[in-house]
Amino acid sequence: MTSQDFINECRYRITYKHNDKVDTLKGEDNFIETENVHCVWFNKSLQNYKGLFIILPLDGKYYECTYNGDKKELYIDTYNKESNECIELKEED
């Protein structure tokens, strides 16, 4: 698997995951395309990959994809942003 293959696979899987949860019975129609999924951070170490993804327009979540090259497994974790707090730190002399 190349780096671009990993990113493309993650974008596809996140799109499917998002669209699978859209409730058309409730009148929701916020389906997305893979073009709406953006990689904001990526790393490759040996045969393993990790990437952070968001959906634009923002859905309030970010997705962490991890590929285990030894087991040929892809894991997707979904996170919700709960808060964003500013903490002022005092500088020491």
Q: Residue locations for each model-derived region?
A:
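Intrinsically disordered, low-complexity regulatory segments in eukaryotic proteins
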Residues: 22-38
